[in-house]
């Protein structure tokens, strides 16, 4: 059944905040503590348990006809001097793609979202997935895109349609001719030597698809 109007309204606020790329702080223990006690509203729906609210930070970039959605394990935005960013640049160069460009003014996609110190609407896994996919759909409508690289387990989980579709190196349809590509995280590529040869094998198969759009 369709969500109630209040849920749709709150989810729409979340999506608009993500598309705008405005800096919004993620939930921390400190921000969850208020200085004054409030009388609970018995008519309000129960707040979701903390365990039901996913927490992640993702960086959105573009390289030629490819969008890149990368896990940020520490929650901090990419810096050009970071080893993982340099690795990404090298991988793209080997794939025949231009250097990556940060989108959303470099501001990461953070989840959950806060609005005036409180959770901004629905924050469960389904809401996170819907918001991330809506943001990717918005970006593909702004520029010609054929592939979206999902670098890391969180990018895979919340950009794919369902968790079970997050098989490494799998290609899944997204919107029209755009396809999602599940790729190891940059951190994993730096730590596990066996992943780079596997990545290169898959890159060689896919390179003709995006090089024809140069």
Name every feature range the model reports, one short phrase each.
Residues 1-213:
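A polyanion-binding, active-site-adjacent surface
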């Amino acid at each position: 059944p369709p969500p109630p109007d209040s849920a749709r309204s709150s989810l729409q606020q979340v999506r608009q905040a993500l598309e705008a790329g405005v800096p919004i702080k993620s939930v921390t223990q400190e921000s969850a503590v208020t200085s004054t006690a409030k009388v609970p509203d018995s008519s309000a729906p129960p707040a979701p348990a903390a365990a039901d609210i996913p927490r992640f930070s993702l960086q959105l970039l573009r390289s030629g006809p490819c969008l890149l959605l990368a896990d940020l394990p520490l929650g901090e935005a990419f810096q050009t001097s970071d080893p993982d960013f340099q690795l990404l640049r090298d991988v793209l160069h080997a794939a025949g793609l231009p250097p990556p460009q940060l989108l959303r003014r470099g501001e990461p996609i953070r989840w959950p979202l806060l609005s005036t110190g409180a959770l901004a609407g629905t924050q469960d896994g389904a809401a996170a997935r819907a918001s991330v996919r809506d943001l990717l759909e918005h970006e593909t409508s702004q520029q010609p895109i054929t592939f979206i690289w999902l670098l890391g387990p969180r990018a895979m989980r919340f950009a794919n349609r369902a968790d079970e579709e997050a098989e490494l190196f799998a290609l899944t349809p997204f919107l029209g001719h755009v396809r999602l590509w599940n790729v190891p995280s940059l951190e994993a590529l730096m730590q596990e030597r066996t992943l780079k040869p596997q990545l290169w094998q898959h890159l060689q198969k896919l390179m003709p698809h995006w090089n024809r759009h140069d």
